[in-house]
């Protein structure tokens, strides 16, 4: 759909449709590469982010969500994604998008992913601090911070994310993972190796009613996944 099709009328139609079913629009996704070396593509991507931000302001969406890109045109992993140069490129290119979000009263939320430029909590913290805007926040997807090289340290990685980013977490993605053929494969929560106790406690203690969305479910396991995480929430004891 063209950016020009994201009109106020279309936005109001969708807002009313969701409201009629008592549904929030938690995240309006715009997952494009803000670090592409192709300047023409970058300009097009920035324009599309701004169109989504305008639409989000009319939809009443919680956030416009994005990941943080790669230093190549294919949006694929390479070691340079984890360099300081790559982080500087992303910060430079996301800054005008955040400034536009400020004008429109919308939150842009970045999602750290191990294979992308913002690959860990410390790099995410640096982006937040460099930009210095309350309109830039975090989508916390714990599985996306993991890789075959670090998944056994997931409890400490999650703890670090909560400590370093907790105040700025606006949305939480809930999924699970299994190890298959030497790689992590994302699956529905409750069907893999993740322990969500630490995250559920964080939600209950610090983030009441935060938008928390299930990922990697199927029609066959979606209800079971919701029941699994709901039970963890209901039985979690906090002081």
Sequence positions of predicted segments:
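A structural motif
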Residues: 23, 56, 61, 169, ...
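Acidic-and-aromatic substrate-binding clefts and catalytic sites of carbohydrate-active enzymes
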Residues: 1-10, 33-39, 72-78, 115-120, ...
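Hydrophobic residues within beta-strands of alpha/beta enzymes
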Residues: 26-28, 64, 172, 212
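Short secondary-structure boundary segments
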Residues: 68, 176, 216
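Active-site acidic/histidine proton-transfer and metal-coordination neighborhood
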Residues: 12, 17-20, 36-138
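H/E-rich (His + Asp/Glu) clusters that bind or coordinate divalent metals
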Residues: 189-192, 198-206, 210-213
């Amino acid at each position: 759909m063209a950016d020009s099709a994201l009109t106020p009328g279309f936005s109001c139609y969708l807002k009313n449709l969701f409201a009629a079913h008592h549904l929030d629009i938690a995240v309006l996704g715009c997952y494009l590469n803000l670090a592409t070396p192709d300047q023409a593509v970058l300009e097009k991507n920035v324009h599309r982010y701004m169109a989504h931000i305008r639409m989000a302001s009319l939809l009443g969406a919680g956030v416009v969500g994005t990941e943080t890109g790669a230093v190549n045109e294919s949006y694929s992993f390479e070691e340079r994604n984890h360099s300081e140069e790559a982080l500087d490129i992303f910060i430079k290119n996301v800054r005008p998008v955040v400034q536009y979000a400020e004008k429109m009263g919308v939150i842009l939320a970045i999602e750290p992913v191990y294979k992308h430029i913002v690959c860990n909590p410390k790099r995410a913290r640096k982006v937040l601090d460099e930009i210095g805007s309350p309109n830039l926040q975090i989508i916390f997807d714990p599985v996306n911070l993991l890789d075959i090289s670090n998944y056994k340290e997931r409890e400490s990685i999650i703890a670090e994310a909560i400590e370093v980013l907790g105040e700025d977490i606006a949305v939480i993605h809930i999924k699970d993972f299994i190890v298959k053929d030497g790689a992590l494969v994302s699956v529905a929560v409750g069907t893999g190796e993740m322990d969500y106790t630490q995250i559920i406690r964080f939600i209950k203690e610090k983030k009441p009613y935060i938008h928390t969305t299930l990922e990697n479910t199927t029609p066959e396991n979606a209800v079971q996944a919701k029941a699994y995480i709901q039970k963890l929430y209901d039985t979690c004891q906090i002081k």
